[in-house]
Amino acid sequence: MVPERVAVWPGPIWALDFTGHGASSVPLGGGYSVEILMADADAALAQLGSLTLVGHGLGAYVALLLAGARPQQVRGAVLCDGPGLAGGGPRPVTPAVVRPVEKLEQAPDPFALLELARDVRPPDYATSFVRQACQLSELDRPISVCAIERPDWLAAVVEEPGAAVTTLAEALSHYAR
């Protein structure tokens, strides 16, 4: 069943369970990073071919990185609000030893929640992927920001040429052309 918010999309819709989330594999003892999740999405991209990416929360950051890393294959990245959007902030903090909550059915691996909540997201790192996408993509607007929340990395992204603030429906209509 296709969610109503993406019903304007004319093509197939695929969903990805990142490592440690949903029905995907769970690595023993954690070891999660956004770049590991980007590798999951990159493997899907290699199998499916050129795609428009819609990422919610943590998935928005992954979509941005993949748009910069594979600008010829990503036919637009749409960044939306959702859990994990902010990450761990723009700089590292003192590590703490925290016992993750007990695993709940259908919830992400507790280590994923813990490690990805601390994932550092410097604005200049994020904007380097925007610039790469803009320079190498054939699209006039390879990044669309639909998120209302503006963590530091996303506030920097919206200031870059080639990134547009728009609604989800407008972004999907734009990339469907």
Task: Locate predicted features.
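Conserved HGGG/HGGXW glycine-rich cap/lid loop of the alpha/beta-hydrolase fold
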Residues: M1-A23
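A catalytic-pocket lid/entrance helix-loop region that shapes and gates access to the active site
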Residues: P90-R118
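Conserved hydrolase catalytic core segment
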Residues: S50-G87
